[in-house]
Regions:
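Short Gly/Ser/Thr- and Asp/Glu-enriched loop/turn motifs at secondary-structure junctions
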Residues: 108-112, 147-150, 244, 288-292, ...
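DNA-contacting surface of Y-family translesion DNA polymerases
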Residues: 184, 194-343, 361
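Short, internal active-site loops enriched in acidic
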Residues: 119-121, 149-153, 233, 298-302, ...
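Gly/Gly-Pro- and Ser/Thr-rich, intrinsically disordered tail segments characteristic of DNA damage-repair
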Residues: 1-229, 281, 374-412
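Acidic, metal-coordinating catalytic segment for phosphate/diphosphate chemistry
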Residues: 16, 311-412
Length: 412
């Protein structure tokens, strides 16, 4: 049996902004200790809450609330804008620490990752070491969920916060997981939860005691199968490391809340930028280029949609990948038959790069061009030398026989 960790940064965006402020000014107010949120502008009251402090949570403020409604609940609320440059910096530092323990790390979003801790010693002691190193070195806290598969590890890390370690092994599922509301099952969104509750399925335990056929009749084939397996604690234990992928490079992230038509403009670009930079970094690390870029989404009803395009020239540059991905997702979500015409929210976004080459054609083209240029120079030089000799000979003939002795030839 494997040992899988799910490690999740507590209120990541808010924590990282707080740490940055304290690093710049040790006497600054720690945003984590007062009612505060990340998202939008307090003056205009525009934007969506993307992260909140524990004191803010006590006012009933939730992720994905509008800033206006959050301020109504807490008039003294501190609102700060998102700072994705800082988030990327701390995310890289967070993952670097995890990879110092094992290379079996799968980053699933900017602030969370799975780690295969099989055969790495006592799981609780290891989790304590990792948690303490992140707190002492980087200044923020994490939750660690421990189980034998990814779903249960994720569920465990979502138990009480912050700075906690929780286990949820299969034998603990009836006591720890089944009493929870069905909406707290990882991957069960608001609309799915509402559908299930209309059929009397209110807890995860209720779903676990419902047949696959009934669940599929309510949610469809894929949605029903997911809830059937998830409610029983069944999930993959495979941690996908970056170097295992050979024929394509892709990164995807499960969002902290759904992206909808209302918050699309405010939030999608930052998600795509982060994913594009991840894909670009991996391509460059392996020295390869991609000619096809694709974007994938998963809706809050478990449907996956994707779109791709072929580039004129292969690339591994983040800016071009981001620009291409932005155009693709606009078409996928907002186009004539876009996802948002039938779906209300996106819970997962991915960016991929395929149709790879290692740059040999680029190098060959460069070398061929250089060779052609050198050959052209030599040919031009030889032609000039030949003309100089002919001109010198002509001058001699003219000097001996007169100017009319030689004239230019022409073709008819």
């Amino acid at each position: 049996m494997k040992t899988i960790f799910h490690i999740d940064v507590n209120s990541a965006f808010l924590s990282w902004s707080a740490v940055k402020r304290l690093k710049e000014d040790p006497n600054a107010l720690d945003l984590r200790t007062v009612p505060s949120v990340v998202g939008g502008d307090r003056k205009t009251r525009h934007g969506i809450v993307t992260a909140k402090s524990i004191p803010a949570k006590k006012f009933g403020i939730k992720t994905a609330d509008t800033v206006a409604s959050a301020i109504q609940r807490c008039p003294d609320l501190i609102v700060i804008p998102a700072d994705f440059t800082t988030y990327r910096e701390y995310s890289r530092a967070f993952i670097k620490i995890l990879k110092s323990y094992t290379d079996k790390v799968e980053q699933v979003s900017i602030d969370e990752a799975y780690l295969d801790a099989t055969n790495l010693g006592d799981p609780i002691e290891l989790a304590e070491r990792i948690k303490a190193e992140i707190r002492d070195t980087l200044g923020f806290t994490v939750n660690v969920g421990i189980s034998s598969n990814k779903l249960l590890a994720k569920m465990a890390s979502d138990f009480s916060k912050p700075d906690k370690i929780h286990t949820l092994f299969i034998e603990e599922v009836p006591d720890k997981m089944w009493p929870l509301p069905i909406g707290e099952l990882h991957g069960c969104g608001k609309k799915t939860s509402e559908k299930l509750q209309r059929f009397g399925i209110s807890t995860i335990g209720d779903a676990a005691s419902t047949s696959l056929e009934v669940l599929q009749s309510i949610l469809g084939e894929k949605g029903g199968e997911y809830i059937f397996n998830g409610s029983r604690g069944n999930s993959s234990d495979k941690v996908h490391t970056e170097h295992e992928e050979a024929k394509s490079y892709s990164n995807e992230t499960t969002l902290p809340h759904d992206i909808t038509p209302d918050n699309y403009e405010a939030e999608m670009a930052q998600v795509l930028k982060w994913l594009s930079e991840k894909v670009s970094a991996r391509l460059k690390k392996d020295g390869v280029f991609a000619k096809t870029i694709d974007v994938q989404v998963k809706t809050n009803t478990f449907h996956r949609r994707s779109i791709q395009t072929k580039l004129p020239d292969a690339t591994n540059e983040a800016d071009l990948i981001f620009k291409t991905a932005t155009g693709l997702i606009e078409k996928l979500l907002l186009g004539e038959n876009g996802v948002f015409r039938t779906e209300t929210g996106i819970r997962l976004v991915g960016v991929g790069a395929t149709d790879l080459d290692n740059g040999e054609y680029k190098q060959l083209d460069l070398f061929s061009y250089q060779k052609e240029q050198e050959e052209a120079k030599l040919e031009k030089k030889a032609q000039k030398e030949k003309e100089d000799k002919l001109n010198a000979m002509a001058d001699k003939i003219k000097g001996k026989f007169g100017e009319g002795a030689i004239s230019r030839g022409f073709s008819r």
